[in-house]
């Protein structure tokens, strides 16, 4: 008898199952698992084997892609920067609220950072920030992200503010620095489980109040630009008769 030919579809399926995963995709998956571990267990709870278990891959997979714990942390920092920049760039590219009928995209993104799955990344980011104080390379990665975030936030603010493009650069610097400081503080409270603000509309309300306060200050343009806010304004000397 002539032997039956092998069923090509079944054979191909078997080959596909044994095919190695895309290395870049596997690295992203491992980094995402590590981010979740950082959020749940902190930096002390991060190890290659725990990442393997969280990602559902065979033992030794993480150490194959990232030989040392330092290499793993650096890759996680890069992955987090990649994810965060993509979200913030989406805010910069989006239109503002139409006619004041809805909250700004920026406010919506801020609230989303306090909700899963982004809440885990918020917590992991603070864990990495602490690691950066002892690892200059991680610090440099996070600083690049911070610089990019600051510029994007600056551009978003100009876009959202009425007549934002007409404001003096130093005034926009003040507004950007102060609102970004508020947002960073809010994210820290979210990371601790403190939902002091619940809705995008509340975020917009606070940001609007901050903007109004800065624009109404006789020190606008010097509140953060050159540290003027830390220096009490000198009183003019009263002329003696």
Name what the model sees in each region:
Residues 75, 86-122, 172-179:
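Hydrophobic alpha-helical connector segments
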Residues 67-71, 97, 116, 133, ...:
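Residues in soluble alpha-helical coiled-coils and helical-bundle/repeat scaffolds
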């Amino acid at each position: 008898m002539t032997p039956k030919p092998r069923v090509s579809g079944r054979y191909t399926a078997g080959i596909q199952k044994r095919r190695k995963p895309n290395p870049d995709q596997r690295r992203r998956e491992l980094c995402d698992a590590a981010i979740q571990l950082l959020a749940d267990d902190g930096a002390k709870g991060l190890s290659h084997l725990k990442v393997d278990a969280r990602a559902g891959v065979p033992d030794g997979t993480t150490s194959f892609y990232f030989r040392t714990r330092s290499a793993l942390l650096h890759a996680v920092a890069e992955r987090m920067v990649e994810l965060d920049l993509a979200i913030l760039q989406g805010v910069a590219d989006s239109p503002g609220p139409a006619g004041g009928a809805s909250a700004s995209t920026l406010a919506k993104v801020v609230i989303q950072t306090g909700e899963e799955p982004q809440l885990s990344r918020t917590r992991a980011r603070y864990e990495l920030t602490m690691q950066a104080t002892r690892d200059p390379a991680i610090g440099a990665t996070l600083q690049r992200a911070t610089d990019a975030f600051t510029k994007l936030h600056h551009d978003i603010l100009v876009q959202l503010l009425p007549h934002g493009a007409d404001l003096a650069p130093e005034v926009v610097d003040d507004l950007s620095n102060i609102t970004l400081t508020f947002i960073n503080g809010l994210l820290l409270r979210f990371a601790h489980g403190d939902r002091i603000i619940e809705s995008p509309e509340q975020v917009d309300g606070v940001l609007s109040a901050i903007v109004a306060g800065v624009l109404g200050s006789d020190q606008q343009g010097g509140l953060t630009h050159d540290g003027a806010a830390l220096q009490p304004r000198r009183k003019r000397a009263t002329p003696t008769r």
